[in-house]
A protein has these predicted regions:
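N-terminal secretory signal peptides that target proteins for export/translocation
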Residues: 1-6
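Bacterial N-terminal signal peptides
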Residues: 9-23
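Cleaved targeting-peptide boundary
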Residues: 22, 26-40
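Acidic, Ser/Thr/Pro-rich low-complexity intrinsically disordered segments
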Residues: 36-83, 89-91, 102, 116, ...
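Extracellular/luminal low-complexity segments enriched in Ser/Thr/Pro
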Residues: 95-104
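A short beta-strand micro-motif common to beta-rich folds, especially ectodomain repeats
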Residues: 104-115
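Extracellular and select intracellular beta-sandwich modules with Ser/Thr-enriched
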Residues: 107, 119-123, 242-244
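Predominantly extracellular/luminal regions of secreted and cell-surface proteins
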Residues: 123-150, 253-254
Length: 254
């Protein structure tokens, strides 16, 4: 009847309002304790994704991870939980192998880990067409910048009061894009990107909040001279930790 229809319409508006008004301040925060205290919780997944058509191993960390039953990714994927070395018995970590078909659409997918006791909090998992590289943890200064192939996607997490530095080698006139995905994939970091000369001294380009990227930075730059260049990723407030993770796609794309 009309009265019931109006009631459902008002409830629908309330649901939409809750979705639209979800506070940005909650992005990247640690997941709240699960309603089921025996359910698993997972920390940020590093690397933050996989190259489609390739298999990759991930060591998940968190709580209550023993006795796993599976992983839900939100896309077609082959997930294996190896049984060697007593994998699956440690409540704080678990190794999984993930392989996605070569025709998997590039994008962001939901990621959850399940055990016999429940299902974990949600993380974002990325499927990409670029090779995946993980930060080596030794790249906290321009002089120790981690060399990267191009194109690639680099995954890492910044430490407090420190940036992560990477080195790329380009040809004269080469155009490159640097797309930092952070807030868009649930990170706490308010990232900025900088491009320096090969010594890490002269700043060539900078971005903090790129339009349409939910405060994530993005730079497209044409290098006039061939050689090495330094890329820096840092939180604008110098914060850091496991929840301040990021991924930067590097290549000649729009």
């Amino acid at each position: 009847n009309i009265k019931e229809s109006l009631r459902l319409f008002v409830l629908g508006l309330g649901t939409v309002a809750l979705c639209v008004c979800y506070p940005a301040s909650s992005w990247g925060q640690k997941p709240p304790p699960p309603a089921n205290p025996q359910a698993p919780t997972i920390n940020p997944v590093i690397p933050t994704g996989v190259q489609r058509g390739q298999a990759a191993d991930f060591v998940l960390t968190g709580t209550n991870l023993a006795s796993p039953t599976g992983v839900s990714i939100g896309c077609a994927a082959k997930v294996t939980i190896p049984s060697e070395e007593k994998n699956g018995t440690d409540p704080t970590k678990c190794k999984v192998r993930i392989e996605t078909p070569a025709d998997t659409p590039i994008g962001w997918y939901t990621f959850r880990f399940a055990t016999i006791k429940g299902v974990s909090n949600l993380r974002v998992f990325c499927v990409d067409d670029l090779p995946q590289v993980v930060a080596d943890g030794k790249n906290r200064s321009a002089s120790t910048a981690q060399a990267l192939p191009a194109p690639c996607t680099i995954s890492g997490a910044v430490a407090a009061e420190q940036g992560d530095y990477y080195k790329i080698t380009v040809k004269a006139g080469q155009r490159m894009s640097f797309d930092c995905q952070a807030r868009r994939i649930g990170s706490a970091i308010d990232a900025y990107l900088k491009i320096y000369d090969g010594k890490g001294i002269r700043e060539l380009a900078y971005d903090n909040d790129s339009p349409g990227c939910q405060t994530d930075p993005r730079i497209t730059y044409t290098f006039k001279q061939a050689g090495d260049y330094i890329i820096e990723v840092r939180d604008v407030l110098l914060r850091g930790g496991p929840e301040f993770f990021y991924r930067v796609r590097i290549g000649d794309f729009p």
